[in-house]
């Protein structure tokens, strides 16, 4: 249409110019010839431009047909200069680097599988009966048969898998994480023939970040677990030593439990978190002696490492502050926090006609530091102290005891008393080339809390924790020193890495009561050697 308009305009302009020339007697013949020549040149130039425009239109139509492949569409056919900027932007969005060669995307969500295959060899100088996880509070004494037997295991059950799902939706950054291994509750004959180790879920949580706020829900490492960085739930940001032991290390408090956490990131360096976590009132296996008259009633109300019938009053509440230095200078992480826990029970008092319920609140404080003195060397430390928090110390000591209360000459009720306990872990870590070294010392302490059991028909009997004639499973302290070495044999960002993970540890445990002629301590030496393939 525009081509027709331009042609008509040129014809009319030419005719008008000729008419004016023939009617003007004063115009010179040379001027008329010059004007005609100029008009012819202009028409020729416009015809060239029209031909070029037609070629450009045909080229654009061909490209449009190739892109749409015959799909019906509405297109803007206006001729304009092509700009490469939008195409570049699309390429950058769709071709941004992936977290891992194994990552894949569905829409705007990225899925990243990971994990490792572990071939683990374990030697212990006494027969604990454990596999990848050491029962720190149950090391056999030298006056038992197990204390004179060594044990050796070869297993792949410490192998692990995980899946990270991440995406950004508007202003919301979402991360979902799933992690499992094969350290579940195995059958008693698991090592006989086929070694069918039980799969278990370690972690499964969803994390939402929006602005300065972060919310976490699911099963995760609790806030009492030491961090290396901020208050992050990511396993790589936690201080769990370099240990190969599935029970981590004596001195490291932790849980992996159902929880909800809110974190305020006040700045790039400072974070404050508040968490509610699944509770469990715990007395340990053969550690606490209940009053004789109430033993049958109290048994199902406290976890003795063998049941899940505990009543629990309300969730444990934990808060923690974390400060991290900037990118310049030494790498420093500092944290401090507090926790609150509760215990409760109900009994039918001796000589009473109605039930009696009792509860008590306990808690504690914690703190830690992770100091990078240089690029390849750091010092680490963490401690916790409180009452009613023994469960957090790898289930090695009790939370509370129940003692009798005389209400009359032959009538009794009962009440709660918390057990004081503490943990400490100190260490140094060094990285040189493909080698990582860790040196650690850790300990747990559990305060005695016993009473004269006036409900027992046998005079002079004591109950509670750590009293006279208490079992040697009532531990006063546990200690462990370790040297740990991880060597990377081969690593490729596309194919993963092959590592050798080693650990050499010495442990001791000391009970509160030592019978005449019995050993004062139980000792254990153990070594781990693992060949591990890590997915990229």
Question: Over which residues does each language-model region extend?
Answer:
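Bacterial N-terminal signal peptides that target proteins for export
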Residues: 1-8
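N-terminal periplasmic/intermembrane-space "pro-region" immediately following the signal or transit peptide
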Residues: 20-130
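Outer membrane beta-barrel
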Residues: 99-288, 313-328, 370-376, 380-391
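Transmembrane beta-barrel strands of outer-membrane/channel proteins
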Residues: 115-123, 178-182, 217-221, 274-278, ...
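Outer-membrane beta-barrel translocator domains and adjoining extracellular loop/strand segments
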Residues: 127-131, 187-197, 228-235, 283-305, ...
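Short sequence motifs at beta-strands and strand-loop junctions characteristic
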Residues: 150-156, 196-198, 250-254, 309-314, ...
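Detector for outer-membrane/organellar transmembrane beta-barrel domains
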Residues: 328-483
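Outer-membrane beta-barrel "beta-signal"
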Residues: 522-536
């Amino acid at each position: 249409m525009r081509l027709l308009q331009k042609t008509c305009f040129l014809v009319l302009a030419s005719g008008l110019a000729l008419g004016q020339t023939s009617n003007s007697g004063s115009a010179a013949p040379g001027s008329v010839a010059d004007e005609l020549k100029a008009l012819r040149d202009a028409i020729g130039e416009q015809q060239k431009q029209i031909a070029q425009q037609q070629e450009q239109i045909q080229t654009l139509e061909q490209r449009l047909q190739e892109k749409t492949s015959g799909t019906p569409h509405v297109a803007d056919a206006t001729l304009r200069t092509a700009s490469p900027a939008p195409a570049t932007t699309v390429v950058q969005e769709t071709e941004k680097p992936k977290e891992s060669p194994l990552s894949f995307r569905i829409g705007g969500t990225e899925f990243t599988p990971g994990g490792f295959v572990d071939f683990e060899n374990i030697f212990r100088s006494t027969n604990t009966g454990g596999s990848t996880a050491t029962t720190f509070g149950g090391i056999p004494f030298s006056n038992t048969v197990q204390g004179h037997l060594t044990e050796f295991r070869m297993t792949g059950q410490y192998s692990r898998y995980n899946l990270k799902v991440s995406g950004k939706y508007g202003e919301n950054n979402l991360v979902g994480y799933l992690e499992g291994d094969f350290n579940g509750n195995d059958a008693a004959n698991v090592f006989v023939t086929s070694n069918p180790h039980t799969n278990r879920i370690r972690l499964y949580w969803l994390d939402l970040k929006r602005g300065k706020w972060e919310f976490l829900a699911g099963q995760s490492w609790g806030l009492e677990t030491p961090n290396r960085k901020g208050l992050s739930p990511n396993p790589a940001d936690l201080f769990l030593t370099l240990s190969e032991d599935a029970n981590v290390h004596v001195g490291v408090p932790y849980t992996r439990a159902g929880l909800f956490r809110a974190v305020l990131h006040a700045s790039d360096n400072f974070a404050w978190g508040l968490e509610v976590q699944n509770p469990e009132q715990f007395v340990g296996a053969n550690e606490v002696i209940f009053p004789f008259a109430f033993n049958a009633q109290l048994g199902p109300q406290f976890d003795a490492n063998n049941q899940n019938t505990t009543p629990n009053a309300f969730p444990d509440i934990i808060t923690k502050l974390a400060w991290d230095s900037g990118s310049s200078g030494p790498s420093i992480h500092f944290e401090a926090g507090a926790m609150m826990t509760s215990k409760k029970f109900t009994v039918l008092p001796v000589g009473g006609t109605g039930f009696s319920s009792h509860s008590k609140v306990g808690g504690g404080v914690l703190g830690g530091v992770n100091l990078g003195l240089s690029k390849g060397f750091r010092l680490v430390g963490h401690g916790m102290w409180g009452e009613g928090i023994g469960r957090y110390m790898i289930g090695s000591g009790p939370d509370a005891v129940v003692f009798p209360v005389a209400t009359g000459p032959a009538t009794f009720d009962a009440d709660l008393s918390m057990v004081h306990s503490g943990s400490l872990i100190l260490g140094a870590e060094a990285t040189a080339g493909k080698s990582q070294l860790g040196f650690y010392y850790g300990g747990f302490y559990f305060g005695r809390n016993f009473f004269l059991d006036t409900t027992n028909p046998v005079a002079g009997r004591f109950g509670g924790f750590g009293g006279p004639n208490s079992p040697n499973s009532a531990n006063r302290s546990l200690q462990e020193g370790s040297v740990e070495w991880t060597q990377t044999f081969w690593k490729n960002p596309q194919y993963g890495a092959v590592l050798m993970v080693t650990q050499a540890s010495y442990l001791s445990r000391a009970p509160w009561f030592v019978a005449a002629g019995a050993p004062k301590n139980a000792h254990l030496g153990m070594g781990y050697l693992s060949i591990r393939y890590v997915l990229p």
